[in-house]
Amino acid sequence: MADIKFRPLHGRVIVRRVESEAKTAGGIIIPDTAKEKPQEGEVVAAGAGARDEAGKLVPLDVKAGDRVLFGKWSGTEVKIGGEDLLIMKESDILGIVG
């Protein structure tokens, strides 16, 4: 795990995709070309939060280290420190696993 030199702003989070299994329960090996990108990841960094209509800071529900599920088309893929990551809004996260 590389030390990320990037801090997301407002209600955004940085997520590292969690690698999916390369083999099915029946023992069939899935080639890389047939795999779908996982929709599960680990929060690497989170912004301070968003402001409500009154200007009050509303903190995020997720924090670094949380394992999360997100939509198939959520986030923007970026490369930070040689690592492929996603930047997304907290609202794109469906829930926290565990």
UniProtKB/Swiss-Prot annotation:
Keywords annotated in UniProt: Chaperone, Cytoplasm
Physiological role: Together with the chaperonin GroEL, plays an essential role in assisting protein folding. The GroEL-GroES system forms a nano-cage that allows encapsulation of the non-native substrate proteins and provides a physical environment optimized to promote and accelerate protein folding. GroES binds to the apical surface of the GroEL ring, thereby capping the opening of the GroEL channel.
Family: Belongs to the GroES chaperonin family.
Identification of the protein by name: Co-chaperonin GroES
Primary subcellular site in the record, as a coarse category: cytoplasm
Record gene name: groES
Quaternary structure, from the entry: Heptamer of 7 subunits arranged in a ring. Interacts with the chaperonin GroEL.
GO biological process: chaperone cofactor-dependent protein refolding
Pfam family, one: Cpn10
CDD domains in UniProt: cpn10
NCBIfam families tied to this protein: PRK00364.1-2, PRK00364.1-5, PRK00364.2-2, PRK00364.2-4
Intracellular or extracellular location(s): Cytoplasm
Gene Ontology molecular function: ATP binding; metal ion binding; protein folding chaperone; protein-folding chaperone binding; unfolded protein binding
GO cellular component: cytoplasm
